[in-house]
């Protein structure tokens, strides 16, 4: 095990605070509508230009071990806020820096760090309650567009695209972001359920122009095993042929004789069928087959449920108004499932989302809810260059997270105004002793900081603006984009309550840990040993008999 350097007290804290300041100073220049850009070096290709706080934070790694520990703790604030609320990373970093800076003054003057932390926690809890009180629900398309625009650094086209997407697929629908092929942003909406499996043979295509197989009013056969013997399928095929309707078969795989027979029947026009592999793998495949069954009003033919292919009847098959099968995707439109059953299934999957531990599982479950409840929208981001595309795509993703947060918990006045208003709940607070009161004061001062930074980045005098905004009431604030004092909500400058709340809570949590740190342990830098000398010269013939 490598030797460690142990540093105590002020020496440890001051070094860590230096790291906090280096990271925060690089991140906070991006805050607000007039925030500046930061250029990030890439080991391959050109540099990335960004105004996204968390992207800047993630790039920072400092040489000094203690400074780096401080920087990493604040990086945690940014990434945690980004994970929970999807935005507010720069605000969280600015708040954390301010709480640490003010707190260090009190710690240096001999106050008890634990009591300071208790005061900070008490103030933050009161501020969060106040934010919830002043929050208003975000329901209209206009409000959703405003939240998206602000989060995307005042880009109204992004906000409008997101609002349009949410309008089409509903609040629960899946909205994904992809690279576009043109200069303009585009929105593609897929109604119904789509999964990423296409036809098993191009001979199933019946619409050569679009290269898709279209089935109108088809039956849907769902099976969880491989099908290779046509005898297994014959009873069902005969019943479907009598009904005179097309058939979509979704199974683990369809191969050999079974696939060949289906293709021949299709070409001859005897029976219109399309065979598709089941989506997903393992347990997720079973769950998705069950989803499709509920959506189409059918049953999965599986041994576990006591059903076999040979004995399957039309009653076990699902139905839909229309199904389109492409090379890579299958879309089921207007399944015949009962609305009550679909709702019950959505509830069940939502309960699993609550219990999910990994982000990946949560994302996949969320996709399943969307496919059952609404549809899928794809925002294709257009830009002139690769660098611009990356930067814009990151902003669209941020804005998307922010709008979801706004729909979830509502909105408050943006531009740092909500935090100024929430200070009223803290002003009357008192702690158990003078040190706790100092902790409350630290938070009071920190809650001005986002507004100060927004104004500073806009090139104005921060103290004057903070005093003017604090003297006002309600949504009265300073719109840095226009340099005017306005009603922030009417002007469309709003923040999701969840973003503001999460930023404050995460900042206070990490800053409190830093203030109560009294020792730091870091690995000593390794000294590289000098290279050993070369091999000695040849030994020559030593006259040894072999």
UniProtKB/Swiss-Prot annotation:
Transmembrane domains' residue ranges:
none
Q: What domain of life does the native source organism fall in?
A: Bacteria
Keyword flag Secreted: no
Which subcellular locations apply to this protein? Cytoplasm
Gene Ontology MF terms in the entry: ATP binding; ATP-dependent protein folding chaperone; isomerase activity; unfolded protein binding
Gly residues composition bias: residue spans: 534-546
Q: Which CDD domains match?
A: GroEL
CC terms in the record's Gene Ontology section: cytoplasm
Give the reactions, separated by semicolons, that this protein catalyses: ATP + H2O + a folded polypeptide = ADP + phosphate + an unfolded polypeptide
Record InterPro entries: Chaperonin_Cpn60_CS, Cpn60/GroEL, Cpn60/GroEL/TCP-1, GroEL-like_apical_dom_sf, GROEL-like_equatorial_sf, TCP-1-like_intermed_sf
Q: Where does ATP bind?
A: 30-33, 51, 87-91, 415, 479-481, 495
Keyword Cytoplasm attached: yes
Which UniProt keyword terms apply here?
ATP-binding, Chaperone, Cytoplasm, Isomerase, Nucleotide-binding
Under Enzyme Commission nomenclature, its number is: 5.6.1.7
**Pfam family membership, one:** Cpn60_TCP1
Q: Name one GO biological process term.
A: protein refolding
Residue span of region Disordered: 526-546
* The protein's assembly and partners: Forms a cylinder of 14 subunits composed of two heptameric rings stacked back-to-back. Interacts with the co-chaperonin GroES.
Which family is it part of? Answer: Belongs to the chaperonin (HSP60) family.
Query: What the protein does?
Result: Together with its co-chaperonin GroES, plays an essential role in assisting protein folding. The GroEL-GroES system forms a nano-cage that allows encapsulation of the non-native substrate proteins and provides a physical environment optimized to promote and accelerate protein folding.
Q: What is this protein called?
A: Chaperonin GroEL 2
Organism for this UniProt entry: Burkholderia lata (strain ATCC 17760 / DSM 23089 / LMG 22485 / NCIMB 9086 / R18194 / 383)
């Amino acid at each position: 095990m490598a030797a460690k350097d142990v540093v105590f007290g002020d020496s440890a804290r001051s070094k860590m605070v230096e790291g906090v300041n280096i990271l925060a100073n690089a991140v906070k220049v991006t805050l607000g509508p007039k925030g500046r850009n930061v250029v990030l070096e890439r080991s391959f290709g050109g540099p990335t230009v960004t105004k996204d706080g968390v992207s800047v934070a993630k790039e920072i790694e400092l040489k000094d071990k203690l400074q780096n520990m401080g920087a990493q703790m604040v990086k945690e604030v940014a990434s945690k806020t980004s994970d929970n609320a999807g935005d507010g990373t720069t605000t969280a970093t600015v708040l954390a820096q301010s709480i640490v800076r003010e707190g260090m003054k009190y710690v240096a003057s001999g106050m008890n760090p634990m009591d300071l932390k208790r005061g900070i926690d008490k103030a933050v809890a009161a501020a969060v309650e106040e934010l919830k009180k002043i929050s208003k629900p975000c329901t209209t398309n206009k409000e959703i567009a405003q939240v998206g625009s602000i989060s995307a650094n005042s880009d109204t086209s992004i906000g409008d695209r997101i609002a349009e997407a949410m309008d089409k697929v509903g609040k629960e629908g899946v909205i994904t972001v992809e690279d576009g092929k043109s200069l303009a942003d585009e929105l593609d909406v897929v109604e119904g359920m789509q999964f990423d499996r296409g036809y098993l043979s191009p001979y199933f295509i019946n619409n050569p122009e679009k290269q898709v197989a279209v089935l109108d009013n088809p039956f849907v056969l769902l099976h969880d095993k491989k099908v290779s013997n046509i005898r297994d399928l014959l009873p069902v095929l005969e019943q479907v042929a009598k009904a005179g309707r097309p058939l979509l078969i979704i199974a683990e795989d369809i191969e050999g004789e079974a696939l060949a027979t289906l293709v021949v029947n299709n070409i001859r026009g005897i029976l219109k069928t399309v065979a598709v592999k089941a989506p997903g793998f393992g347990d997720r495949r079973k769950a998705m087959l069950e989803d499709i069954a509920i959506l189409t009003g059918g049953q999965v033919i599986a041994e576990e449920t006591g059903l076999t292919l040979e004995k399957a009847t039309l009653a076990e098959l699902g139905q839909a108004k229309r199904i389109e099968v492409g090379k890579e995707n299958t879309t089921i439109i207007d399944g015949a499932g009962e609305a009550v059953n679909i709702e019950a299934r959505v509830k069940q999957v939502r309960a699993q989302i609550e219990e999910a531990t990994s982000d990946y599982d949560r994302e996949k479950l969320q996709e399943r809810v969307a496919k059952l409840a609404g549809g899928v929208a794809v925002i294709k981001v257009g830009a002139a260059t690769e660098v611009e595309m990356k930067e814009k795509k990151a902003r669209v993703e941020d804005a998307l997270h922010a709008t979801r947060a706004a729909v979830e918990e509502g909105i408050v006045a943006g531009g740092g105004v909500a935090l100024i208003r929430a200070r009223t709940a803290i002003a009357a607070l008192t702690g158990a002793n003078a040190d706790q009161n100092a902790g409350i004061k630290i938070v009071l001062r920190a809650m001005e900081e986002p507004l100060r930074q927004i104004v500073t980045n806009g090139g104005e005098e921060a103290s004057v603006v903070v005093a003017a905004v604090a003297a006002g009431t309600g949504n009265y604030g300073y719109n840095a984009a226009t340099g005017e004092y306005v009603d922030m909500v009417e002007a469309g400058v709003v923040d999701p309550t969840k973003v503001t709340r999460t930023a404050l809570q995460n900042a206070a949590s990490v800053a409190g840990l830093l203030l109560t740190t009294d020792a730091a342990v870091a690995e000593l830098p390794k000294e590289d040993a000098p290279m050993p000398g070369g091999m000695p010269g040849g030994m020559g013939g030593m006259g040894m008999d072999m």
